Amino acid sequence: MDILNLAQEIIHGKRLTREDDLSFFLTCDLEPLCQGADEIRKACVGDKVDLCSIINGRSGRCPEDCKYCAQSAHYHTECDVYDFLPEEAILEACKMNESEGVDRFSIVTAGRALTGEEFDQAIHAYETMHRECKIDLCASMGFLSAEKLHRLHKAGVTSYHHNIETSKRNFPNICTTHTYDMKVETLKKVKAEGMCACSGGIIGMGETWEDRLDMAVSLAELGIDSIPINALMPIPGTPLEHLPCLTEQDILRTIAFFRYINPEANIRLAAGRALLTNDGETAFRAGASATITGNMLTTAACATIRSDRSMLASLGRDVTPAYWKEA
């Protein structure tokens, strides 16, 4: 298989499916694989890099048993524990990210689903942000009903995040308190509501390369718009604490073949950027087109966002948010 020829075929409309033999992605030389992925990214997505930032709106005490997660109540970690944040803190974070040129801002909450009074608080916070800010708004609040997704959409949320985490085969090895199919059903509700669907996973949890390929194909089948790729950073106290970190080469290979299989999606760097050269610069030469940036309300957040924007601009990427262009 000539990987660069395949890249050109994808640019001209070919789409890879579950019926194709994708094993060549696991054995081909990394350099041409990344080169082809970057060509696909440029042709199918363009040079605009989508920057998003998150705030941990509610932390800890999660009843789910995801083996990688510090916020699970099943494990003894040093995770912060608090209820839904005051709206003032959320609005301050949103405005700070907007002032630094971030494209999207999301409230992320621990737990199976945000419900009751806390969900009402979230709706009010989104309505306020939508009224006072121009930044795009996203949410990540677990297994929500179609009715709750509609309320978020009406409040100004345009994208909903809900990771499938891994392949369907491997999912029971990672979590037993909910199922892969429940994840898929939630994403279908997101698409039905007309919101952008953001879903990816974590690599380096003991899965096989075939599991990663399967996850990439599953996301393509679901029509996912934004695919965050996290490289596991093992957390003390969790069942995966002793797993080794992935090599940079493994992360880049994964990002690259995700781009071949999902040519029009935003492939988004998430956790594990520290494992990559210059905090992810190499990934942006291997098919990545988006990243999570910043660090909530710390002083370091602004410095991190500015550093990311500078690095990306040096690669010739467009880091100007739409709301600045419209001003």
What is each stretch, according to the model?
Residues 119-128, 155-161, 209-225, 279-294:
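Short, electropositive alpha-helical surface patch
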Residues 1-28, 220-327:
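Auxiliary Fe-S-binding modules of radical SAM enzymes
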Residues 47-54, 61-63, 67-78, 123-130, ...:
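Mobile, glycine- and charge-enriched loop segments
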Residues 13, 37, 66, 107, ...:
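Conserved, mostly hydrophobic/aromatic
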Residues 105, 111-115, 186-210, 229-244, ...:
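Conserved strand-turn element in the central/C-terminal portion of the radical SAM core barrel
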Residues 34-75, 82-106:
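N-terminal pre-triad scaffold of radical SAM enzymes
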Residues 74-93, 97-190, 195-200, 225-230:
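Core AdoMet radical
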Residues 140-145, 202-216:
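Active-site glycine- and acidic-residue-rich loops that bind
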